Regions:
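Serine-hydrolase catalytic-loop signature spanning alpha/beta hydrolases and amidase-signature enzymes
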Residues: 423, 431-441, 453
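Gly/Ala-rich beta-loop-alpha elbow adjacent to hydrolase catalytic centers
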Residues: 496, 500, 504
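Active-site loop/oxyanion-hole signature of alpha/beta-hydrolase fold enzymes
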Residues: 403-410, 415-418, 448-496, 532
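Flexible "cap/lid" loop of the alpha/beta hydrolase fold
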Residues: 505-510, 514-551
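Trp/Phe/Arg-rich N-terminal binding region typifying the photolyase-homology
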Residues: 2-234
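Conserved alpha/beta-hydrolase catalytic His-Asp/Glu region
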Residues: 529-534, 552-618
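Glycine/tryptophan-enriched, flexible segments
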Residues: 39, 183-391
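Conserved loop-alpha-helix segment in the C-terminal half of the alpha/beta-hydrolase fold
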Residues: 446-448, 615-655
C-alpha cells in the first residue's frame, strides 16, 4: 500500500471573515485492490496553482473514483493578483493541461466567475462525493477554500454534503508538521530524504457528459478582468506597472541630478526559435506545459555542456542575462512556473539530482554539487519548501500573540498580521534584522485607538522568504507599494523604524497617492543640504569582500546578538526577552540569510531623507531617540529641523521641540 497524499477535511468557519482548517489527518491510499474497486460517485479536482498532471497527488487520489471532473475557474479573486505575463502563463499551462487530460479520455472544465457557485452546482450535476484541492498558505486562497466549505454547509445537496480534501505534494516524509524543528540548522541535521515524484495517474473512469467550456484567448481574459467589480483603480494599476527605478531616475533627471542608468536604451528584438519555451510576449520567463518546462530545465542544468539546439541556446542566453548573482537566474526563469504549479518542486529536485548523478557515475559528493546550475535549482526548491512548511506551520499552530497571514509577492512568501476592524489604515514597517513582531507591544494599542493595523515582515527577514536575489532599497520599497495596493487596498499611514523608515520615505517620495502620512522612528538615511548627493545607481555588484564580510558578520551577530539588541533598547532592556533573541537566532539559520547580509555592504542611502520627503505634502512625524546607538541623534535632529521644516521632530529621552 502506497501513501500518496495527506489531505485534511475542512471544518466550518469559526468566526466571521475567518476560516480555519481542522487538522484531521485523512490518508489517501491507492493499492492494486483499490484500483480495481472504484469508489462510488465522482470526484471534482479543483485546479488553482497546480496546473499539471505530473506529480499531482490530488488527481491521483481522485482517479480512484468512478468519474473525475477536473475544474479550473477564472476567478477574479485569484487572477487580480497576476500580472499580464502570469495570465499568459496560465493560458499556456491550461492549454497543455487540457491536452494531457484529453490523451487519457478526460478534459478540464473551464468556467468564469466565483468558484464556490460552480462547485455547488456541479456537485449535484455529476453526483460528486469528494472535492480535491491543493492545500494553500496564501491568505486569499485559504479564504476561498473556506468560502467553498461555508457554501457547502448552507446548501442542501441531493446526495449529501461532499467532503473537501486538501492534498499536498510532500517534499519530505513528515508525519507531524508540529514536530518539525523551527530552526533550519536543526532541520538539516535530520537529513530527511526528498521523496520521489509520481507519474501522471491513469484516469480509467467513465468520462462525464458535461459542457467543458472553451479556453479563452488572452484578449477574452483581459476583457473579463476589466469587468471585475473589485478591480483596482486604473491609477493604482499604473502605479504597480512602473518600477521604482524608472520613476526615481525620471525625477532625478528633471531635477538635474545624475544617475548611472540610461532609461532610453533600445534593445533590438530577438527572434525566438520555433521551439522556444519563452512563450509570453515579454519572453522573460519559461512557460508552456510541464514537458516544456522540463525541457527548459534540462537545458538549464546542462549549461556547461554547450549545445547545438536553438531552444537550449536560448535558455543559456537567458540564464546569462538573469544571473544577477550566482544562482539567481533559476528562480528568475522558473519561479513563475513553480508558483503556478506547472511543475512541482520535488520534480525539479529529482531532475537536478538525477543529472548530478549522471555526471558523477551515480554518486553524490558530500562536498556539494558539481555545477552551479544544479546547485541553483536544488537549493532554490529546497529553500522554497522550507519557507512553505514554516508558513503552513505558523498557520496551523495554536498560540502566539498575533494571527499570521501569508501574502505571495513576486513568487515569494511574505508574513504579516492584521488587527482592528475600523478606522484609518496603518502599516508598520520594521528595521534591519527584525520582523513584524518588533511592534508586538504596539499593534493592539494602535488598533484599540480606532485604527486598522497591518504589520509586515519584509522579504529577507523573520519568517518571510529569503531568496537568492539582489536586495536593494528600491526592491523593498516596491514590496511595500504592492502590499498597500494588493493587501490593504487603500492609502495608509506609514510608520517605519530604522532602515524600514528609509523604505517608507522612498514610498512616500515615489507614490504619494498611497500614503496619508509618514512616521519615521530612528530612521536610516541622512539629511544633505540642497541635496548635493553623489550620483545614484540601483546596480549592485556582489564581491569577494561582501561575501566574506557577510559570513564574519553573521558569526559575530550570533555570538553577540543579545548585547547588540539591548543597546537598541537602552531604557527598556526588559523588552529584549528570551523569545525575541531566540527568534532572531532562529532566523539567522534560515536558508538565504547570508545573501541578505551581503546586501549590507551594497546599501545605497545616497538619496537623503530631505530629498525623499520634500515633495510629500501630507504630515510627516520624525521621532529620533537621543540614545540611539546607531546615529549621532542630536546632529541628525538639528539637520532635520533645519532642512525638513515640514516635519515635526520631537526628541526622545531629551529636550523636546
Amino acid at each position: 500500500m502506497a501513501v500518496i497524499a495527506f489531505p485534511r477535511i475542512l471544518s466550518r468557519f469559526l468566526a466571521p471573515n475567518h476560516y480555519s482548517l481542522r487538522r484531521n489527518k485523512c490518508i489517501c491510499c491507492v493499492s492494486p485492490a483499490a484500483r480495481e474497486t472504484k469508489r462510488k460517485g465522482s470526484a471534482i479536482v479543483w485546479f488553482k496553482q497546480d496546473l499539471r498532471v505530473d506529480d499531482h497527488l490530488g488527481l491521483m487520489a481522485a482517479s480512484n473514483y468512478q468519474a473525475v471532473l477536473p475544474l479550473y475557474v477564472f476567478d477574479h479573486r485569484i487572477l487580480s493578483l497576476y500580472s499580464d505575463e502570469m495570465l499568459e502563463l496560465v493560458l499556456f499551462a491550461l492549454e497543455d493541461l487540457r491536452k494531457s487530460l484529453k490523451e487519457q479520455g478526460s478534459d478540464v472544465m473551464i468556467r468564469f466567475g466565483r468558484v464556490e457557485n460552480f462547485i455547488k452546482e456541479l456537485v449535484d450535476e455529476v453526483k460528486a462525493t469528494s472535492i480535491f484541492a491543493e492545500e494553500e498558505v496564501e491568505y486569499h486562497l485559504r479564504m476561498m477554500i473556506g468560502i467553498v466549505d461555508e457554501t457547502f454547509a448552507t446548501t442542501n445537496f441531493k446526495d449529501g454534503k461532499p467532503n473537501i480534501f486538501l492534498w499536498q505534494t510532500p517534499f519530505y516524509d513528515i508525519k507531524n508538521l508540529n514536530d518539525l524543528p523551527v530552526s533550519h540548522n536543526d532541520f538539516v541535521k535530520l537529513q530527511l530524504p526528498v521523496t520521489s515524484p509520481t507519474q501522471s495517474p491513469t484516469l480509467s473512469g467513465s468520462k462525464l457528459e458535461v459542457d467543458w467550456g472553451p479556453l479563452p484567448t488572452f484578449d477574452d481574459l483581459k476583457k473579463f478582468m476589466n469587468e471585475n467589480p473589485w478591480k483596482l483603480k486604473e491609477s493604482w494599476t499604473l502605479i504597480k506597472n512602473i518600477s521604482a527605478e524608472t520613476i526615481l531616475l525620471e525625477k532625478l533627471s528633471k531635477s538635474g541630478e545624475r544617475s548611472k542608468r540610461n532609461l532610453n536604451v533600445n534593445h533590438a528584438p530577438v527572434k525566438k526559435p520555433d521551439a522556444s519555451v519563452f512563450v509570453t510576449e515579454k519572453g522573460n520567463i519559461v512557460g508552456g506545459g510541464t514537458n516544456a518546462i522540463l525541457n527548459a530545465l534540462a537545458a538549464y542544468l546542462r549549461y556547461l555542456e554547450g549545445t547545438a539546439r536553438d531552444d537550449w541556446q536560448e535558455v543559456h542566453e537567458r540564464l546569462r542575462n538573469a544571473e544577477s548573482r550566482d544562482g539567481a537566474s533559476f528562480f528568475t526563469l522558473f519561479g513563475p512556473a513553480l508558483c503556478l504549479g506547472i511543475i512541482s518542486r520535488r520534480r525539479v529536485h529529482y531532475e537536478a539530482i538525477k543529472y548530478e548523478k549522471e555526471r558523477n557515475a551515480g554518486f553524490l559528493s558530500p562536498f556539494g554539487y558539481s555545477t552551479v546550475t544544479v546547485a541553483a535549482a536544488a537549493d532554490a526548491v529546497c529553500s522554497m519548501e522550507w519557507y512553505w512548511l514554516m508558513s503552513l506551520r505558523s498557520l496551523i499552530s495554536e498560540g502566539g500573540i498575533y494571527s499570521t497571514r501569508i501574502w505571495r509577492w513576486n513568487g515569494y512568501l511574505i508574513q504579516y498580521t492584521v488587527a482592528g476592524n475600523e478606522g484609518p489604515a496603518v502599516l508598520l514597517v520594521h528595521g534591519f534584522g527584525a520582523f513584524f513582531e518588533h511592534y508586538r507591544d504596539n499593534i493592539y494599542g494602535i488598533a484599540e485607538g480606532g485604527n486598522r493595523v497591518w504589520a509586515v515582515t519584509v522579504l529577507g527577514f523573520g519568517k518571510s522568504e529569503k531568496p537568492n536575489m539582489v536586495y536593494t532599497e528600491l526592491m523593498w520599497a516596491e514590496l511595500l507599494r504592492d502590499f498597500v495596493v494588493e493587501v490593504v487596498g487603500e492609502p495608509v499611514h506609514l510608520i517605519g523604524n530604522s532602515i524600514g523608515g528609509y523604505f517608507v520615505a522612498i514610498v512616500a517620495c515615489l507614490w504619494h497617492a498611497l500614503v496619508k502620512s509618514v512616521v519615521l522612528i530612528n530612521s536610516a538615511g541622512n539629511v544633505v543640504p540642497e541635496h548635493s548627493f553623489t550620483q545614484f545607481s540601483n546596480e549592485r555588484q556582489t564581491s569577494g569582500p561582501a561575501w566574506l564580510g557577510a559570513r564574519l558578520l553573521l558569526f559575530y551577530l550570533r555570538l553577540n546578538i543579545s548585547n547588540i539588541v539591548k543597546q537598541c533598547y537602552p531604557t527598556r532592556t526588559e523588552r529584549v526577552d528570551d523569545w525575541l533573541i531566540g527568534e532572531m537566532l532562529r532566523a539567522s539559520h534560515d536558508p538565504g540569510v547570508l545573501v541578505v547580509l551581503e546586501s549590507i555592504f551594497s546599501f545605497n542611502l545616497s538619496l537623503p531623507l530631505s530629498y525623499l520627503l520634500e515633495g510629500f505634502n501630507e504630515k510627516v512625524l520624525i521621532i529620533q531617540g537621543m540614545k540611539d546607538p546607531i546615529s549621532d541623534s542630536k546632529s541628525k535632529l538639528d539637520m532635520l529641523r533645519e532642512h525638513c521644516p515640514w516635519a515635526i521632530a520631537p526628541m526622545m529621552s531629551g529636550r523636546k521641540k
